[in-house]
């Protein structure tokens, strides 16, 4: 089991995120992840910062921990720009990038109101094409792509990422919807959450076993596949016991998920300093 922390990309001072990442690394965590939003809620009063710049700041203050987004919605990103951002961060961090991707939420506030596609089915189709094209552009070889939403004609983007053949990709998906998990099976990891429109509860270890059975059917093997679960854990043995139950079910990463409530940044710093609940 490896341990990370995820925080909202909210605030006004990007340097705070670099300091937090340094504290996370010093306390023995394995990863630092940030949300990817342009807006969040209709009446959200605070600032929202760019995740790639925040992660670049974090890359300069750390040397060991994994860095990434949880999650980026490729459907609203120009694929060439996303390729450049991810390659640059992977090189800046000496090969520590993890790209977390998903459809994104909320579809109105964070997409439709900004002129981006709000329909989930259309965004899913754009997601598929963007990810296929992204892998091609990461190759640093001449690449063409002809899809319904994305067209690329003999483009070669250099340099490629430091990690070869590409950085790992984790896919966010809501359980128990099958299709997103089938989509995620072709990549390197899953970031599952419960679809609260269907079940008013968090994921359980049994849910993890069920979703891994589905992914295993698609992949044939779960060797090397990451299962990344976000939640909150108590410091010490009580938290470690709860996490152990998920580890037995197949979870490989526990991510302490900080929510933007109250003085959440101070809470994140305190929890980071306490270290993971091993």
What is the meaning of each model-derived region?
Residues 1-278:
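Active-site-adjacent structural elements that line small-molecule/cofactor binding pockets in enzymes
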